[in-house]
């Protein structure tokens, strides 16, 4: 089990509440597809794919993770199974996306996005990635 300090919980929940995370994740997806073009392969068959629509799905899952920070693995069990067994997403792609989300958050909050704050977000996303990758093991 991950230990969360009150400062970490506050940073993550306040940022989610006070930031247009759908825009942040849309921009992060667009960045990921541009910088790491092979990640687009999961969406090429979907002619109606738009980053903004998928961003809404991602943000919904992340909001749930924020609400259940102490039990993300249980929360993401079915989502992990879907990504592993049905979608066959390379789990390395999760790292690429979360790195791009952190870049977008840093750009948006440049005056207050310190290395310490980045560390909090790295920790949060490592927990999320571990949970969504659980069924791959």
Swiss-Prot record:
| Pfam families, per database record | Globin (PF00042)
Question: Which GO MF terms are attached to this record?
Answer: haptoglobin binding; heme binding; metal ion binding; organic acid binding; oxygen binding; oxygen carrier activity; peroxidase activity
Kindly state the tissue distribution recorded for this protein. Answer: Red blood cells.
Q: Which CDD domains match?
A: Hb-beta-like
- The entry marks the following residues as binding heme b, namely 54, 83
- Residue ranges annotated for the Globin domain, each copy included: 3-137
Which keywords annotate this record?
Heme, Iron, Metal-binding, Oxygen transport, Transport
- Check the record and name the InterPro entries matching this protein: Globin, Globin-like_sf, Globin/Proto, Hemoglobin_b, Hemoglobin_oxygen_transport
The question of whether Metal-binding is a record keyword is answered with yes
Query: Per the UniProt entry, what are the Gene Ontology biological process annotations, in alphabetical order?
Result: hydrogen peroxide catabolic process
Q: Does the keyword Metal-binding apply?
A: yes
Instruction: Write down any Gene Ontology CC term.
Output: blood microparticle
* Family of this protein: Belongs to the globin family.
| Role, per record | Involved in oxygen transport from gills to the various peripheral tissues.
Q: How does it assemble?
A: Heterotetramer of two alpha chains and two beta chains.
What protein name does the entry list? Hemoglobin subunit beta
Gene field: HBB
């Amino acid at each position: 089990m991950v230990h969360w300090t009150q400062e970490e919980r506050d940073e993550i929940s306040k940022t989610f509440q006070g930031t247009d995370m759908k825009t942040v994740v849309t921009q992060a997806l667009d960045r990921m597809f541009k910088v790491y073009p092979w990640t687009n392969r999961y969406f090429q068959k979907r002619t109606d794919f738009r980053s903004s629509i998928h961003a809404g799905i991602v943000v919904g899952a992340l909001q749930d993770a924020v609400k259940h920070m102490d039990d993300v693995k249980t929360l993401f069990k079915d989502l992990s199974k879907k990504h592993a067994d049905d979608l066959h997403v390379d789990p390395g792609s999760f790292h690429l996306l979360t790195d791009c989300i952190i870049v977008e958050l840093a750009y948006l909050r440049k005056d207050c996005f310190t290395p310490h704050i980045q560390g909090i977000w790295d920790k949060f996303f490592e927990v999320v990635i571990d949970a969504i990758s659980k069924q791959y093991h």
